[in-house]
């Protein structure tokens, strides 16, 4: 795969992922707000004001998640995003960090 094709596939995967997360947040029972600026998605838990931030890192073709518990770097491994340090897939990681920050179970229902 050429570098341009690889970049296009990476950017498409990021866009699809962020849209899926936004849709899941819209349908979640937990009171959360989100704001997106280009490829940075900031999720704010309304009960306590804490945030989880997802950002595109094009130079290394990763998706980074910043949470209270730390920073996580995810690479796209078909069929989805995998964290290089915990081995978790993105849905599991997001549910975990959101639950930790909320102090109660959060499930976005992502696949």
What are these regions (language model features)?
Residues 2-53, 57-111:
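N-terminal intrinsically disordered, cationic/polar leader segments
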């Amino acid at each position: 795969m050429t570098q341009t094709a690889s970049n296009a596939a990476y950017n498409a995967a990021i866009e699809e992922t962020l849209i899926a997360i936004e849709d899941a947040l819209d349908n979640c029972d937990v009171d959360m707000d989100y704001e997106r600026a280009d490829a940075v998605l900031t999720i704010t838990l309304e009960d306590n004001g804490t945030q989880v931030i997802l950002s595109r890192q094009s130079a290394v073709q990763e998706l980074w998640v910043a949470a209270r518990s730390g920073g996580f770097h995810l690479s796209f491994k078909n069929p989805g995003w995998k964290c290089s340090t915990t081995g978790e897939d993105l849905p599991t990681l997001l549910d975990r960090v959101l639950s930790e920050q909320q102090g109660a179970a959060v499930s976005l229902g992502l696949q």
